[in-house]
Design a protein with these regions (language model features):
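A structural signal for alpha-helical segments
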Residues: 24, 31, 68, 120, ...
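Heme-based O2/NO sensor domains and their adjacent alpha-helical segments
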Residues: 12-15, 19, 37-139
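Hydrophobic packing residues in well-ordered alpha-helices of helical domains and bundles
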Residues: 29, 73, 125, 129, ...
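Serine/threonine-rich, low-complexity linker/repeat segments that form flexible spacers/stalks
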Residues: 2, 9-30, 34
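Short terminal or interdomain "cap/linker" segment that borders an active site or interface and mediates
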Residues: 3-16, 142-179
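Short low-polarity hydrophobic stretches
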Residues: 1, 51-54, 161
Length: 179
C-alpha cells in the first residue's frame, strides 16, 4: 500500500478558495472575537451538555462508574477554549493548519489515560462544528445592532468553520479498517 502525504497548507488554501473565504471575511471573524470570546464559557457549556446526552460521547467524560469526571471535563473544556481562541484569530499560517491536523490525531488515537476507550467518533467532531456555527450565528444576531453586518459575519464564520472540517477529520480519512 503506497501512502501519499497530504500537503495540508496547499489543501487548506484550496478549500479557502473553494468556499470563497475572503480577507474581508477573515476581518469580520477577527472583529467578532471579543463578542465570541466573552461568551466562550457558555458556548462550551452548551456543547458539553449536548455531548453528555449521547453514550458514545459521554464515555469520554465520565469515570469507570459512569459519574461525571470533573477534572477531565474541565481539561477538555480548556482545550476547546484554546481551539476557539486560535480560531477567532482566523490564522492562515502552517502552524495553525498543523494544529488542526494534530487535533484530529488526538481524537482518532486511543487515549493513553483511558486505554479501554475507542477513538472519538468523527460525527461528534463535525457535530460540534455545527453547534458552534449555530451558536455563533445566534450570538451575532443577538448582540450586533447592524443585522446586515451580523449576517455577513455569520456567513464568514460558516465558511471558516467548514474549511476546518477536513483537517479536523484528517486522521479519520486516512484510517483503514485493516490496519
Amino acid at each position: 500500500c503506497m501512502s501519499t502525504m497530504i500537503n495540508w497548507p496547499a489543501r487548506f488554501a484550496e478549500m479557502i478558495d473553494f468556499v470563497g473565504l475572503s480577507e474581508e471575511d477573515r476581518q469580520l471573524i477577527k472583529a467578532s472575537a471579543p463578542l465570541i470570546l466573552a461568551r466562550a464559557g457558555s458556548l462550551n457549556d452548551f456543547v458539553y451538555d449536548a455531548l453528555f446526552k449521547y453514550p458514545q460521547s459521554r464515555q469520554f467524560f465520565v469515570t469507570a462508574h459512569d459519574e461525571p469526571d470533573a477534572k477531565r471535563i474541565e481539561d477538555n473544556k480548556q482545550t476547546m477554549l484554546s481551539w476557539l481562541r486560535a480560531t477567532v484569530a482566523a490564522p492562515l499560517n502552517d502552524g495553525y493548519i498543523r494544529y488542526l491536523v494534530g487535533v484530529s490525531q488526538m481524537h482518532r488515537n486511543i487515549p493513553i489515560h483511558r486505554p479501554g476507550l475507542p477513538p472519538v467518533p468523527p460525527r461528534f467532531i463535525s457535530g460540534i462544528l455545527s453547534y458552534y456555527q449555530t451558536l455563533i450565528t445566534d450570538l451575532l444576531h443577538e448582540h450586533m445592532s447592524d443585522s446586515a453586518l451580523a449576517l455577513r459575519t455569520s456567513k464568514a464564520w460558516n465558511k471558516w468553520l467548514m474549511v476546518q472540517v477536513e483537517p479536523l477529520l484528517a486522521s479519520y480519512m486516512s484510517y483503514q479498517e485493516d490496519e
